Curated annotation (Swiss-Prot):
Belongs to the G-protein coupled receptor 1 family. One of its GO terms (molecular function) is G protein-coupled receptor activity. It is found in: Cell membrane. It comes from Macaca fascicularis. Residues 1-34, 93-106, 173-198, 273-286 are extracellular. This is Melanin-concentrating hormone receptor 2. GO terms for cellular component: neuron projection; plasma membrane. It is a multi-pass membrane protein.
Length: 340
């Protein structure tokens, strides 16, 4: 993503409901739950759907696919799977928490959402390490930095994400609360289970990958600026690291890191705070809703960041558009010939 993508963070409402007791009543749905939040996330996801399809289409249609392209394509696919599952959760929110799609679909949607969260974190981390070796240590691990092996690495990350999400496949189900509402929720048996699972999810998908990602990009920036200063001090007429490239790389990294932190951190902080609260306050609800919107907004922002911050995507889009147009014209000509 970007190298940072958070479109893939698990913001499903069921994880905030502390559903360790099946008799725990689902709170009366407010206008925010049933109208405002579903509408906002619906708009955000619609935009993200278009943007991520554009990214995947651009990469697939490109003749020369690079190693970063494979990582970005996988992140965009994860965003798409995540966004496609959102209408079901939006429908549940709009109906005041009622789930009408049955138990199997509840398990599938919730589990894929969590699997995508693990996958996004893993892909972002590995891609950051790959960028470090490509720019700072270009002659190391070259045998692993091929398109074929990068595809295998990404498949391995998806498989590992599926395994890490096994608790969700087991415990996500339709729960009937005492007010009669049947909701798709994560059914844990005790507050301790909720505590340990929240810590497990937060650490593995945010607090563990974040330092690795930051270290990789800090080292990349330090190396790039060091090379630029060396060339500048040597007064090279044609420096290998021009100032424009350094500034562009710095700006891109700062933007992507900022988007990652701003979109993911609030939700995970809210989840940790929720563990200590017996009765959520109005401020907590406001923060929770904002964290959800920020998490899903990243799914819409990331594709456009790829396009705006990457010169390769800006060059590829017109080329692919011309190729598609030429192909359509050729097909139309063949069709006309067949009629005469």
């Amino acid at each position: 993503m970007n190298p940072f993508h958070s479109s893939c963070w698990n913001t499903s409402a069921e994880l905030s409901n502390k559903s360790w007791n099946k008799e725990f009543a689902y709170q009366t749905a407010s206008a925010v739950d049933t109208v405002i939040l579903p509408s906002m996330i619906g708009i955000i996801c619609s935009t993200g759907l278009v943007g991520n399809i554009l990214i995947v289409f651009t990469i697939i249609r490109s003749r020369k696919k690079t190693v970063p392209d494979i990582y970005i394509c996988n992140l965009a696919v994860a965003d798409l799977v995540h966004i496609i599952g959102m209408p079901f959760l939006i429908h549940q929110w709009a109906r005041g928490g009622e789930w009408v799609f049955g138990g199997p679909l509840c398990t599938i949607i919730t589990s894929l959402d969590t699997c995508n969260q693990f996958a996004c974190s893993a892909i972002m981390t590995v891609m950051s390490v790959d960028r470090y070796f490509a720019l700072v240590q270009p002659f190391r691990l070259t045998s692993w930095r091929t398109r074929y092996k990068t595809i295998r690495i990404n498949l391995g990350l998806w498989a590992a994400s599926f395994i890490l999400a096994l608790p969700v496949w087991i415990y996500s189900k339709v729960i009937k609360f005492k007010d009669g509402v049947e909701s798709c929720a994560f059914d844990l048996t005790s507050p301790d289970d909720v505590l340990w699972y929240t810590l497990y999810l937060t650490i593995t998908t945010f607090f563990f990958p974040l330092p690795l990602i930051l270290v990789c990009y800090i080292l990349i920036l330090c190396y790039t600026w060091e090379m630029y200063q060396q060339n500048k001090d040597a007064r090279c007429c044609n420096p290998s690291v021009p100032k424009q490239r350094v500034m562009k790389l710095t700006k891109m990294v700062l933007v992507l890191v900022a988007v990652f932190i701003l979109s993911a951190a609030p939700y995970h902080v809210i989840q940790l705070v929720n563990l200590q609260m017996e009765q959520p306050t109005l401020a907590f609800y406001v923060g929770y809703y904002l964290s959800i919107c920020l998490s899903y907004a990243s799914s819409s922002i990331n594709p456009f960041l790829y396009i705006l911050l990457s010169g390769n995507f800006q060059k590829r889009l017109p080329q692919i558009q011309r190729r598609v147009t030429d192909k359509e014209i050729k097909n139309m000509g063949n069709t006309l010939k067949s009629h005469f």
